[in-house]
Amino acid sequence: MTAAYLPSILVPLVGLIFPALGMALLFIYIERETIA
C-alpha cells in the first residue's frame, strides 16, 4: 500500500513547506506595509 509511505512524505512536506510559506507571506505583508 502507498498509504504506508504517506506519513514519511507528508511530515517533511508540512514541516518545511508551511513554515516557508508562512514566513514568505509574512515578509511580503511587512514589506507591503512599510512601502505603503
Curated annotation (Swiss-Prot):
Q: Which SUPFAM superfamilies match?
A: Subunit VIII of photosystem I reaction centre, PsaI (SSF81540)
**Where in or outside the cell?**
Plastid, Chloroplast thylakoid membrane
DNA repair as a keyword? Answer: no
Does Chloroplast appear among the keywords? yes
What is this protein's name? Photosystem I reaction center subunit VIII
Q: Which GO terms describe its cellular component?
A: chloroplast thylakoid membrane; photosystem I
Q: Name one GO biological process term.
A: photosynthesis
TM helices/strands, residue ranges: 10-30
Where does the UniProt entry say this protein principally localizes? plastid
